[in-house]
Each structure stands twice: as structure tokens, then as C-alpha cells.
């Protein structure tokens, strides 16, 4: 099995395209089941966040796996294959491992170094595990990605250099308001992970009073109580909007919550002297209807604007340190993967030896029926010990050699020498020519030639 990543992110797709590609949590089990039902896909994890939609898959072939994944994405999202391909990137084997680790460390985030992606990756892995679509390869990849992400945050200053998306967005809000957030009334719409982060960040920055609203009132109450905020019914959304200066919108609603009509009514009761009403739309699909940005007295900061305005580079030293961690961990993972690839060959060799021993002991029993049970047992134990000792050193050594770059040749030689029948896969790091199956249009400029490992 080989590792393949197919996805789109804020780097390759505008927010409107990401909205169309986003897979709602309720739809994840079906999408995952469809992925592993494809002929070339055996394992799958689907990551769908505000800034990216990615499929991590174990595939038996590059071209077939790519075609299967693109077909399921088109089916699950309703996006025509041609439109889908315009925004996709592809990473294969070593490049896929590197991409996974860069995502986990926050190096690939809109705001470099933000740690929220770790929780999102963990959630995606739990969804896939619950749907029984992970196996040895993706289990190990996800576990190591989460570990590498934690290591990057604990061993470097990337947490200080890189802000969370909410922190960065609120930094832009202070510029638009021409003041800090102290004593600025705020509203958070949504009580999920991003909404919770919004309340926490607003409280830390001294904004207040802070109100929280959510379709599920209980969650809003619990979140508000945790930070000394106030929960308000979703039915009071318009009235509350007229009393605040900052809104963090981060729901998982399928349609816009802050429509032009709702905001217009709120503005009618809001004093112009308060300055602009700043709406931070951090949701995918968008919580703020596009036409709201045209209203006088309103400033909308959405994901597209974040990508254009946020300086998302941490200090050079911190970024370089994290890149070094990623490079080291990628090498370690590839060593493990190469060792895992040789395991079936070693198992086949030991199986062949066991079969030979069984056959020869059977022949001995026929030729020497006079042997007692104790004698036959002693002979069997002796022969097994001899075989195990003969095999121990070469099998240990071939595992060591296979873990080195180019080590796949040793397993191949072992199969050739002993005429072992082991299912063959292309070695790690072997990059096929990118020829997309006829069922899927050629990938557009956003897609990566896997031989480059580009971002």
C-alpha cells in the first residue's frame, strides 16, 4: 500500500470553492465508506475544516487511487470533476508524509503555527477509526503526525510566532476599530471549537461584555459560564448585533446566519458613533452572507481576506526549527514504512522454512516409525531451533537494510533468491508519471506533480 493525499486548501481555492468542497460531519461516515469501497483505496481519513478539505488514503496504485478519490469527492460534494480538479493538489508517498507533518505542525496553516489544526486532525482520525476506514498505514501516519505536531509546539517558539486564526482576525479588527478591544462589546455566534476559541481570546484581550449565541442553547450557556460571558437566545441575534462592535461567527450551519436582512435591521438600531460593526467570518460554509460586506458601517473579515492580509510567517528561526523537525520525522517515518514493506517478505520466508520443516518431519515419521513420541518431539525442537538460528541474522539484517533509502532492493533480492510469492507494490519514494484516469479531467495548475513534493 502507498500513501496518497488529495486535497484543496486556502492556498489553492477561494472560500467559495472550499464551501462547495466541505464535507459536513454528518456526511463523513458515508464519504469514508464510499472511499474505501473503491477498488484502489483500502484506508481513508477525510479532513474537512474551514481552510482545507483533504483525503489521506492508502492506495494500491497511484493513478487508480487518484481517480477513485476524485470520483468520490465529486460525488460527495456535488462539485463537477472539472471544477474540482482546478483546485486540487496531490502528494504521493514521501511528499504525502511531509505534507501531513507540515499540516500537523501548523506550517501549512493560513496563520503559521496555529495549534487548532491538531484537534481537527485528531477529530478526523477519530471519525475514520469509528467508520473502520483506517488500517496500519493511516493509523501510524495520524498518530505520528499528532506527535510531531505536539513536538513542534513544545520544542520551538512557533506558538509565540504564529497566532490562532481567531487571534489574527481580532488583530485585524483592532486596526479597523482604530483601538484595542478593551471594553468593546462582542458577540460570538457558534459554540463549537472555533467559537470556544473566540470567547477565550476575546476574554483574554479584555473585550466585554461578551455574549454567546448558538442554535443549541445548552452549549451556549456552558461556554458562556466558562468565561464569564452571557448566553443569549439565537432568537435575539438581531437585537444583540445592534449592541456590539465585534462579532466572531463560527458556526457549522449549512446556510448564512448573518444575512443582509438581519444585519440591516441591526444597523438601524445601532448608533453610527460606535464606529464600524466588524464581522469576523471564520466559518465554512460562510456565516456572513456575501452582500453584507456592501452595507455601510460594516467591515467583514472572511477567510479570503485573512489570506490576503494576515502576515502568516513566524520568526525565521522558529520556522526553520520546525522544518528541521519535520524533515527528521519524515525520514524516521519512511524508515518505518520501508521496514513495514519488507515484513511480508520476511514472513513469507519464515513460512517457507516452517513448511519445509513440517514436510521433512513428516517424511522422517514415515521412514522411522520406531521413534518414540519423545524422540520425535526432540528432533522437531532441534530442527526448529536450527532453522530459526539460520534465519535470525539474515532477517534482522534485511529489516535494517530495508529501512535505509533504497532498501527496497534487499527485500526484492530475498524474494528472488527464495522464490517467494509476496504481493508486489512500488517501493517507497518511487514516483509514477502523473497521468490522471480518463474518468477524471487532468489536474489544474494547483495540483502537484508528486515528483516535486511542492506545496
Swiss-Prot record:
Pathway noted in the entry: Porphyrin-containing compound metabolism; protoporphyrin-IX biosynthesis; 5-aminolevulinate from L-glutamyl-tRNA(Glu): step 1/2
- Provide the catalytic activity annotation: (S)-4-amino-5-oxopentanoate + tRNA(Glu) + NADP(+) = L-glutamyl-tRNA(Glu) + NADPH + H(+)
Which catalytic residues are annotated?
A: 50
Q: Does the keyword NADP apply?
A: yes
Q: Which InterPro entries match?
A: 4pyrrol_synth_GluRdtase, 4pyrrol_synth_GluRdtase_dimer, 4pyrrol_synth_GluRdtase_N, GluRdtase_CS, GluRdtase_dimer_dom_sf, GluRdtase_N_sf, NAD(P)-bd_dom_sf, Shikm_DH/Glu-tRNA_Rdtase
Recorded E.C. number(s)? 1.2.1.70
Per the entry, what this protein does is:
Catalyzes the NADPH-dependent reduction of glutamyl-tRNA(Glu) to glutamate 1-semialdehyde (GSA).
Matching HAMAP family: Glu_tRNA_reductase
Q: What else is known?
A: During catalysis, the active site Cys acts as a nucleophile attacking the alpha-carbonyl group of tRNA-bound glutamate with the formation of a thioester intermediate between enzyme and glutamate, and the concomitant release of tRNA(Glu). The thioester intermediate is finally reduced by direct hydride transfer from NADPH, to form the product GSA.
Q: How is the subunit organization of this protein annotated in UniProt? A: Homodimer.
Q: List the protein's name.
A: Glutamyl-tRNA reductase
Q: Which gene encodes it?
A: hemA
Amino acid at each position: 500500500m502507498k500513501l496518497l493525499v488529495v486535497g484543496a486548501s486556502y492556498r489553492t481555492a477561494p472560500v467559495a470553492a472550499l464551501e462547495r468542497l466541505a464535507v459536513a460531519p454528518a456526511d463523513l461516515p458515508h464519504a469514508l465508506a464510499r472511499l474505501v469501497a473503491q477498488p484502489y483505496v483500502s484506508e481513508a481519513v477525510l479532513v474537512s475544516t474551514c481552510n482545507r478539505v483533504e483525503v489521506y488514503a492508502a492506495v494500491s496504485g497511484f493513478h487508480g487511487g487518484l481517480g477513485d478519490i476524485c470520483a468520490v469527492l465529486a460525488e460527495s460534494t456535488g462539485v463537477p470533476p472539472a471544477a474540482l480538479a482546478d483546485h486540487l493538489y496531490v502528494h504521493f508517498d514521501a511528499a504525502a508524509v511531509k505534507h501531513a507533518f507540515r499540516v500537523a505542525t501548523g506550517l501549512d496553516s493560513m496563520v503559521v503555527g496555529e495549534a487548532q489544526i491538531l484537534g481537527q486532525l485528531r477529530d478526523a482520525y477519530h471519525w475514520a477509526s469509528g467508520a473502520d476506514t483506517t488500517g496500519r498505514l493511516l493509523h501510524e501516519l495520524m498518530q505520528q503526525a499528532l506527535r510531531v505536531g505536539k513536538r513542534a509546539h513544545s520544542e520551538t517558539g512557533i506558538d509565540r510566532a504564529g497566532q490562532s486564526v481567531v487571534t489574527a482576525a481580532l488583530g485585524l479588527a483592532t486596526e479597523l476599530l482604530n483601538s484595542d478591544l478593551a471594553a468593546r462589546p462582542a458577540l460570538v455566534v457558534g459554540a463549537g471549537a472555533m467559537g470556544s476559541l473566540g470567547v477565550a481570546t476575546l476574554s483574554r484581550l479584555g473585550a466585554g461584555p461578551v455574549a454567546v449565541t448558538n442554535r443549541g442553547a445548552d452549549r451556549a450557556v456552558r461556554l458562556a459560564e466558562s468565561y464569564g460571558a452571557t448566553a443569549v437566545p439565537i432568537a435575539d441575534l438581531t437585537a444583540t448585533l445592534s449592541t456590539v462592535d465585534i462579532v466572531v461567527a463560527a458556526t457549522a450551519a449549512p446556510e448564512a446566519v448573518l444575512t443582509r436582512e438581519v444585519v440591516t435591521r441591526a444597523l438601524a438600531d445601532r448608533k453610527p458613533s460606535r464606529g464600524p460593526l466588524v464581522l469576523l467570518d471564520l466559518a465554512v460554509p460562510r456565516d456572513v452572507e456575501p452582500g453584507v460586506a456592501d452595507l455601510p458601517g460594516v467591515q467583514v473579515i472572511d477567510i479570503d481576506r485573512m489570506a490576503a492580509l494576515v502576515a502568516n510567517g513566524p520568526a525565521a528561526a522558529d520556522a526553520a526549527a520546525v522544518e528541521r523537525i519535520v524533515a527528521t520525522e519524515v525520514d524516521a517515518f519512511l524508515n518505518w514504512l520501508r521496514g513495514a514493506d519488507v515484513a511480508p517478505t520476511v514472513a513469507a520466508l519464515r513460512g517457507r522454512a516452517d513448511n519445509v520443516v513440517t514436510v521433512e518431519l513428516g517424511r522422517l515419521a514415515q521412514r522411522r516409525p520406531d521413534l518414540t513420541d519423545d524422540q520425535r518431539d526432540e528432533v522437531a525442537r532441534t530442527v526448529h531451533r536450527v532453522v530459526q538460528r539460520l534465519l535470525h541474522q539474515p532477517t534482522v539484517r534485511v529489516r535494517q537494510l530495508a529501512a535505509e533509502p533504497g532498501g527496497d532492493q534487499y527485500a526484492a533480492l530475498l524474494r528472488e533468491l527464495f522464490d517467494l510469492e509476496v504481493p508486489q507494490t512500488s517501493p517507497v519514494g518511487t514516483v509514477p508519471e502523473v497521468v490522471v484516469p480518463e474518468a477524471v479531467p487532468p489536474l489544474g495548475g494547483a495540483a502537484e506533480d508528486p515528483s516535486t513534493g511542492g506545496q
